UniProtKB/Swiss-Prot annotation:
The keyword Transcription regulation does not apply. The gene is rpsU. It comes from Symbiobacterium thermophilum (strain DSM 24528 / JCM 14929 / IAM 14863 / T). This is Small ribosomal subunit protein bS21. The keyword Kinase does not apply. One of its GO terms (biological process) is translation. The lineage of its organism: Bacteria, Bacillati, Bacillota, Clostridia, Eubacteriales.
Length: 58
């Protein structure tokens, strides 16, 4: 888990922004969204195939 230590003259808002930025860089939020609902293996394969097809034709 990410940790943010607040400096002497740092506001809570700026520390919260740093924390959110760290989570986003670590990919935690994307992982949470991905695991929010169970996805059958067949659906995962289909999504992966469609993503590859989109990448190929762009």
């Amino acid at each position: 888990m990410s940790e943010v230590k607040i400096g002497k003259n740092e506001s809570l808002d700026s520390a919260l922004r740093r924390f959110k930025r760290q989570l986003q860089r670590a990919g935690v939020l994307a992982e949470i969204r991905k695991r929010e609902h169970y996805e059958k293996p067949s659906v995962k394969r289909k999504k992966k195939s469609e993503a590859a097809r989109r990448r190929k034709y762009r």
